[in-house]
């Protein structure tokens, strides 16, 4: 069938030294490829599966790109996931939160709720950001801090409703909560000079979404 053909093509490309990415909605294809990989390719393979007891982490706010670009790309993913219920206030708050965390340099997606609800943590993140960008993020956080507690809860409620189904799940927090995961996507696209190193970077990435175990929204976020 189609899965058998896809597995054959992926293995063929891997054997030929090409970079391979397989995103599998069900997980069966990833399992098939992983069990058939030649031994010499195993060290160059990353299997991303949120169902693992100790999953490989993904930090979309870090890894080989500018903080602002990382924040914008992740914002676009959330906007596409929740297009039917996306509003300007949610856009504004999430954008400022992602930018602030990405510019921090050691943050993760799982910190967004903490940033919005914990004053002490928020000050530790936004202090330097406000100084460096007083007209942009500085103005946003000044507005946010000026809100009453009730106004703040009302403002962030739509965003928190979107984040909770993902970040309340332990296996997804284990994936998105790693600030410095061992694998970053930019490693897959490193130049050929890096491939000549004694420890070559990953060339094969197998992503098991397993929608039945993760849920639609979580699987879409992981796949994006």
Tell me what each language-model feature is.
Residues 2:
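Conserved lysine of the Walker
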Residues 5-224:
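P-loop NTPase motor domains
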